[in-house]
Amino acid sequence: MELTPREKDKLLLFTAALLAERRLARGLRLNYPEAVALISAAVLEGARDGRTVAELMSLGREVLVREQVMDGVPEMLHDVQVEATFPDGTKLVTVHDPIV
């Protein structure tokens, strides 16, 4: 199977998000890369489902709460930017202050 670099990036992101979901299910708090992966994957899947950029910006803020991440992660994570594919093309989705 031949994958483009972009496809490899998406697959790696999905794998990291899956790991983050499993750790959350075990009651563990997520670190910075895990939190970014989970939020990014939610945005990508939402775009695939046909949601709008505005909906995804809002959705990204609902994925995690402060109690689900390690101390200091919300303060380090100001924006998450994801390049998502929509029916009308690729767009950059920015989620501001995703963990409240």
Curated annotation (Swiss-Prot):
Annotated pathway: Nitrogen metabolism; urea degradation; CO(2) and NH(3) from urea (urease route): step 1/1
Record's GO cellular component terms: cytoplasm
A Pfam cross-reference name: Urease_gamma
Keywords per UniProt: Cytoplasm, Hydrolase
Catalytic activity: urea + 2 H2O + H(+) = hydrogencarbonate + 2 NH4(+)
Main location: cytoplasm
GO biological process, one term: urea catabolic process
Subcellular location(s) of the protein: Cytoplasm
Disulfide bonds: none
GO molecular function: nickel cation binding; urease activity
PANTHER family registered for this protein in UniProt: UREASE
Quaternary structure and partners: Heterotrimer of UreA (gamma), UreB (beta) and UreC (alpha) subunits. Three heterotrimers associate to form the active enzyme.
NCBIfam families: PRK13241.1, urease_gam
Protein name per its UniProtKB record: Urease subunit gamma
Organism, as annotated: Pseudomonas entomophila (strain L48)
